[in-house]
Regions:
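Cytosolic covalent-transfer regions centered on His/Cys nucleophiles
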Residues: 1-160
């Protein structure tokens, strides 16, 4: 699964306008609604924010992966929000989250997001990529970083 197949420019909010965790989740859901992927956001927003109370999506190191299933989703869908200031997502390391990757899966494949998040996490572990994502000023820069990383990964796989 390629990240660039899901994270196109219209799926990247940079900068995210939200100042709170709840606002960030709503802003990301609204973007999916704007793209005609979702017809409504209020129930999903309530479900995700309720889930966050018991199972925070913050993974530490400045990133959060909120996720939920929806009957409106046929396949994995996602949107990435980037906050220069960072948002409090109750991260285990206490750091604010600068990258919020919201994923939605179909109810038939509720765990379909795991491969995608794992791939994103591997990419984010690369210090150059992480720095580039955090310093980017336009969604196009983000998609270029993702494409370059995936191209490099493909070359590495060919050499192995």
């Amino acid at each position: 699964m390629n990240l660039r197949d899901k994270l196109m420019e219209n799926r990247i909010l940079l900068p995210i306008q939200a100042e709170t965790q709840s606002e960030a989740i709503q802003e990301l859901l609204v973007q999916l609604q704007t793209l005609d992927i979702l017809t409504a956001t209020s129930k999903l927003h309530s479900a995700i924010t309720e889930k966050e109370k018991t199972l925070p999506s913050a993974a530490g190191r400045g990133i959060a992966y909120p996720h939920f299933t929806s009957i409106e989703i046929d396949d994995l869908d996602c949107v990435l929000g980037i906050s220069k200031e960072g948002l409090d997502f109750n991260a285990p390391d206490g750091q604010f989250c600068h990258l919020i990757l919201l994923t939605l899966s179909s109810e038939e494949d509720p765990f379909g997001h795991r491969k995608f998040i794992t791939r994103f996490r591997i990419m984010f572990d690369n210090p150059e990529v992480r720095f580039g994502l955090l310093e980017a000023n336009h969604p196009r820069e983000i998609t270029d970083i993702i494409q370059n990383w995936e191209d490099d990964e493909a070359k590495t796989d060919e050499l192995s």
